[in-house]
């Protein structure tokens, strides 16, 4: 049985369910009595198993530590405090294409960092055919309005931004006028 996270949205959107974990591990001691250094890393993954796998992949690349040379101490999920305001996130990443490794910087608007990362994964899959396993997130940041670079997010920078109502939905003024079955077809134009 799969356990649901507290921040998982209630509606079934098309976004990939991405969670943020802090994985802590220690190198196995070579000699008796020595204290091994503790290594920590923030990882975006679907679940704890994928988080551990991504952690060991990065440790092999960065610190030259294999899974057999260390042990995982803890895997903790990070929950964001406020999901009420839309923020702009800047994400630095690298991904493996069929020919080479590419570095990228992308900006997304979302209420949570997990949502921005899931947008990133879908965007990379659609535009670059990159699988989620080939994407390595290097750095994330919440951007101030003056730090926004990309035109798609620059258009949303205005605080007094308004959207036109393209389609009006006629609703009954009071609850007593609301019915389950109508005698005529509704007009939606």
Curated annotation (Swiss-Prot):
One Pfam family here: Ribosomal_L18A
Domain of life: Eukaryota
UniProt cross-references to InterPro entries, sorted A to Z: Ribosomal_eL20, Ribosomal_eL20_dom, Ribosomal_eL20_eukaryotes
Signal peptide: none
Gene3D superfamilies associated with the record: 3.10.20.10
Disulfide bonds: none
Keywords: Cytoplasm, Ribonucleoprotein, Ribosomal protein
Gene Ontology CC terms: cytoplasm; ribonucleoprotein complex; ribosome
Main location: cytoplasm
GO BP annotation list: translation
Protein localization: Cytoplasm
PANTHER family, per the entry: 60S RIBOSOMAL PROTEIN L18A (PTHR10052)
Name this polypeptide is given: Large ribosomal subunit protein eL20
Taxonomic source organism: Tetrahymena thermophila
Upper classification of the organism: Eukaryota, Sar, Alveolata, Ciliophora, Intramacronucleata
């Amino acid at each position: 049985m799969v356990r649901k996270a507290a921040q998982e949205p209630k509606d079934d959107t098309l976004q990939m369910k991405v969670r943020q974990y802090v994985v802590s591990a220690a190198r196995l001691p070579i000699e008796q009595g020595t204290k091994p250094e503790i290594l920590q890393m923030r990882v975006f993954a679907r679940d704890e198993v994928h988080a551990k796998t991504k952690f060991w992949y990065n440790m092999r690349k960065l610190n030259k530590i294999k899974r057999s040379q260390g042990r995982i101490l803890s895997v903790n999920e990070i929950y964001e405090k406020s999901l009420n305001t839309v923020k702009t996130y800047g994400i630095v990443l690298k991904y493996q294409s069929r020919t080479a490794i590419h570095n990228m910087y992308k900006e997304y608007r979302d209420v949570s960092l997990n949502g921005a990362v899931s947008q990133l994964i879908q965007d990379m899959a659609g535009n670059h055919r990159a699988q989620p396993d080939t994407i390595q997130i290097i750095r994330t940041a919440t951007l101030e309005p003056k730090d926004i670079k990309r035109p798609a997010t620059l258009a949303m920078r205005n605080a007094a931004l308004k959207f036109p109502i393209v389609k009006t939905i006629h609703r009954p003024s009071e609850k007593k006028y609301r019915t389950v079955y109508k005698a005529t077809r509704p007009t939606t134009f």
